[in-house]
Amino acid sequence: MNFNLLNKVIAGIVFLISFIVLFMTVQPSVSFWDCGEFVAASVSLQVPHPPGTPFFLLLGNIFSKLPIGENLGYRVNMISVISSAISILLLYLIAVKLIENYKGKKADNMFDAIATYVSAAIGALAFSFSDTFWFNGVEAEVY
């Protein structure tokens, strides 16, 4: 039996849960440390400090022009929210592949499919709500 649709549905749910929680807790403005520097450098397309993080700055410049939020800090912070939610989605998909490789086969019955997909979802969401990931997923910071 093929459980690809179930895998895709659970992957979408994992993405939505992490995105919604990060979106609801995103910094409304510039936060501490380098965030203000990254926001200012994104708006003006300048190098914040070497090596410069050019891709983040280009995305920050694009997001700073979007008509969302009240200020530039919020707009640039949304890059971290979106990229963090995508990271959790990819972590879920990688965990599914690792579990399937460990077992030596894809799920062939409903119990194996649910065990594989739910355990990968729990692992991905546990990482999503860990302190360090969550803290850096809601502010304009590059690591």
Residue ranges and their predicted role:
Residues 12, 78-108:
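Transmembrane-helix motifs of polytopic, lipid-linked glycan transferases
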Residues 26, 60, 64, 92-100, ...:
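Membrane-water interface at transmembrane helix exits
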Residues 26-38, 48-59:
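Extracytoplasmic catalytic/substrate-binding loops of multi-pass membrane glycan-assembly enzymes
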Residues 69-77, 105-116, 123-143:
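Aromatic- and kink-enriched transmembrane "portal" helix at the membrane-lumen/periplasm boundary
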